[in-house]
């Protein structure tokens, strides 16, 4: 885990002097927060250019955070496990990442809750190198293979372990490789660093278009997710420390208002219109390919920020089947403390 001092130094270098005050402990706040409102918010995104986390940057691009009176600084950390560490240390006030971290952290006696649940499917795709596609036809063929995940302890790691466990395999039966995302993932698949791996758009679209990779399992849709995981698996969320949520309800409400407004905007516009609002450098594989990646993934987002009632239970079931942190502790997890709809209900 990064030390708090290191993270603060990084934030101070990346942000303006005023924004760097986000390094104060998010769980206690300051005088401005005593009244329940603190309009300066730092949010870590688990890969800001990933389409599965598109609502975060799109909200900023549309100006909805500012219209709520918020000064939001979006930071990026491709590995979800590292993003949660920065939240726990108090150096950011929220994370846009997978919901499953709230369950995993509760078993470590940390209270983290999703305040806006933007998707009930992972949006992840298990890709296989084209020259290995004839040998790896399903997760049962993972044995002896090098499998790429964003990083150990990330949601891609969780899901990979679960897919393997359904075939009677454990993580000892294959080699887990930290492959990151984007160009690092593509390079790993191309040069043989991994045989298969889990990633998202726009990386998926680039691999398929170039012929370097083929889709093995597609969890960008409800149908594909249920086939792979036996039910819904909530992913993209804004999760925050419970103490911060309790101390700053006005700020959290404003964040929910902005994000839900974006979700509704997404459902009212085409992939082309969405792509046009995003930073040009997000389309580093080409504009048409970026539009396709949005079109292939955008259906994962809901329009209201609410959690599907059955989804948390399936996440707990998945984690409880293999995760050393959760396995055997399922009965101690209080799912009602891992998410709330009270803010999106008012948005």
Positions of the model-derived regions?
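Short, low-complexity disordered leader/linker segments with a strong preference
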Residues: 1-40, 347
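Short, glycine-/small- and polar/acidic-enriched structural segments
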Residues: 29-170, 175-179, 195-201, 212, ...
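Soluble non-cytosolic domains of exported or imported proteins
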Residues: 50, 77-81, 150, 154-155, ...
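Solvent-exposed, polar/charged alpha-helical surfaces in well-ordered, non-transmembrane soluble domains
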Residues: 54, 62-63, 85, 89, ...
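Short, solvent-exposed loop/beta-turn-alpha elements that line the ligand-binding surface or hinge
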Residues: 67, 134, 138, 220-231, ...
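Pocket-lining segment of extracytoplasmic ligand-binding domains
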Residues: 184-187, 191-279
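Secondary-structure end/capping motifs
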Residues: 245-325
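Conserved C-terminal helix/tail region of periplasmic/extracytoplasmic solute-binding proteins
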Residues: 313-347
